Amino acid sequence: MPELPEVEVTRRGLAPAIVGRCVSAVNVRTPKLREPLQDLAALLPGLTLEHLERRAKYLIWTFRSAAGEKRWLLTHMGMSGSWRIWPVPAPSAHKHDHADIVFGDVLVRYTDPRRFGSILFMTTDPRKSLPLTKLGCEPWDPTLTAERFYAELQKTHRSIKEVLLSGKIVVGCGNIYCSEALFAAGIRPTRPADAISKARAGSLLEALRKTLETAIAAGGSTLHDFHGVSGETGWFPLACAVYGREGKPCPICGRPIARIEQGGRSTFWCPHCQH
């Protein structure tokens, strides 16, 4: 599943090619992804893309009409989605290529084998409505201090891994990145959130930020379907200390990495180094 790093990699790849350009055509081949697709071929042409930003795992596309009216797309890549840039004329679409948005001589194509993604046209700012208003802080939000993070952790007895995955305090903590950040901070993934000291909470927040920054620089994680906008794979999994390394030696102590299940997801950790 594309997580925060993969969505940010996508945003950074798309923005220079299409921001400031006008939509000239749209081709939708699939009537329904996670939700039915609106008539984007009638709604988008003539609109100029002013801004492309990320909020958690969503992309917010802000458009302006010739009359100055703002319109938005709120997109989510679901379990297997990705956006790809092509010069016009683009290669013929394949089975899982569901939508093309054309900006003159540049085409962006949405591909999603499992069809759990979404493309929603909106006439109101999506940042002011659900689901975005229920999201936790961005990892680099300046208001998310170590003190605030610690205070939020004190409100729940759930395991720290489950709390991070929920996205209610801070967004972006996908399964791979949770395992890696918890290892970097030396915190056991099953430890209750309210049993983490203030100092260790600060270390965890720092580790999470560094893990996500490293993942973005690596182009994200390609485990199955994700590719960047030019078709490139993300190589972060090659640098993982614990994720996907069950039975292999811990890079710190040399003892075997363990795997457990939490909420139906695999967690990788070192029982010797994480407490």
Positions of the model-derived regions?
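Basic, nucleic-acid-binding surfaces and adjacent catalytic neighborhoods in DNA/RNA-processing proteins
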Residues: 22-39, 43, 53, 60, ...
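Phosphate/anion-contacting hairpin/loop surfaces
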Residues: 68-172, 177-184, 192
